[in-house]
Curated annotation (Swiss-Prot):
The keyword Hydrolase applies. This is Ubiquitin thioesterase OTUB2. Keywords: Hydrolase, Protease, Thiol protease, Ubl conjugation pathway. PROSITE patterns: OTU. The record marks N226 as: Required to orient and stabilize the active site H-224. Hydrolase that can remove conjugated ubiquitin from proteins in vitro and may therefore play an important regulatory role at the level of protein turnover by preventing degradation. Mediates deubiquitination of 'Lys-11'-,'Lys-48'- and 'Lys-63'-linked polyubiquitin chains, with a preference for 'Lys-63'-linked polyubiquitin chains. The keyword Coiled coil does not apply. CDD domains: OTUB2 (cd22764). It comes from the Eukaryota. Belongs to the peptidase C65 family. The lineage of its organism: Eukaryota, Metazoa, Chordata, Craniata, Vertebrata. Residues 40-231 form the OTU domain. GO terms for molecular function: cysteine-type deubiquitinase activity.
């Protein structure tokens, strides 16, 4: 499936279908074959610099479908996020529209357990981008509110405010471990990132936060994130 054949998030397809992305690359072929022993399917995301936020948002909400107790717990957390944004210095009128977009899709998941309805929202450019912008602002707020911790992980020449203003909040800015750590903690979402590179080494992955049981799995390759689906354990 080429990136031009879908809008923002693709339909689910077999993990081995991505072997044809690089048919001549022996290392890539081996690593995807290894990955297929633990993951059955993949959804591709558009490579627009927002792929991490969009992939995490969609994948976690999809994992909540049909789980009323977990949805309620997540709603309670989401309802607290405006306080986090206010504490970080954001004015309510500047984030309310983005918060409403995200909260609306959480309510949709609560009322409608269909994958197609959720996918439709995330493939609508306007709705999807508002959701991404909210997740970016929340990530920024979490970092700003814990500046003493996060300042150890960013460039010494850039303070926390500048980092958030230039590297986190703007659309299309790619993310790194700092943003992943912040957003996963801000929403209490455990995720596992599988790394596929062109080094002739073993596959490796990272769990955020460490030792947590992931509910979201992402594939990272050449600065891009796609959504993975783990094989059922028997």
């Amino acid at each position: 499936m080429s990136e031009t054949s879908f809008n923002l998030i693709s339909e689910k397809c077999d993990i081995l279908s991505i072997l044809r992305d690089h048919p001549e690359n022996r290392i890539y072929q081996r690593k995807i074959q290894e990955l297929s022993k633990r993951f059955t399917s993949i959804r591709k995301t558009k490579g627009d610099g927002n792929c991490f936020y969009r992939a995490l948002g969609y994948s976690y909400l999809e994992s909540l479908l049909g789980k009323s107790r977990e949805i309620l717990k997540f709603k309670e957390r989401v309802l607290q996020t405006p306080n986090d944004l206010l504490a970080a210095g954001f004015e309510e009128h500047k984030f309310r529209n983005f918060f409403n977009a995200f909260y609306s899709v959480v309510e949709l998941v609560e009322k409608d357990s269909s994958v197609s309805s959720l996918l439709k929202v995330f493939n609508d450019q306007s709705s999807s981008d508002r959701i991404v912008q909210f997740l970016r602002l929340l990530t920024s707020a979490f970092i700003r509110n814990r500046a003493d911790f996060f300042r150890h992980f960013i460039d010494e020449e850039m303070d926390i405010k500048d980092f958030c203003t230039h590297e986190v909040e703007p659309m299309a800015m790619e993310c790194d471990h700092v943003q992943i750590t912040a957003l996963s903690q801000a929403l209490n979402i455990a995720l596992q990132v599988e790394y596929v590179d062109e080094m002739d080494t073993a596959l490796n992955h990272h769990v955020f936060p460490e030792a947590a049981i992931p509910s979201v799995y992402l594939l990272y390759k050449t600065s891009h994130y796609n959504i993975l689906y783990a094989a059922e354990k028997h």
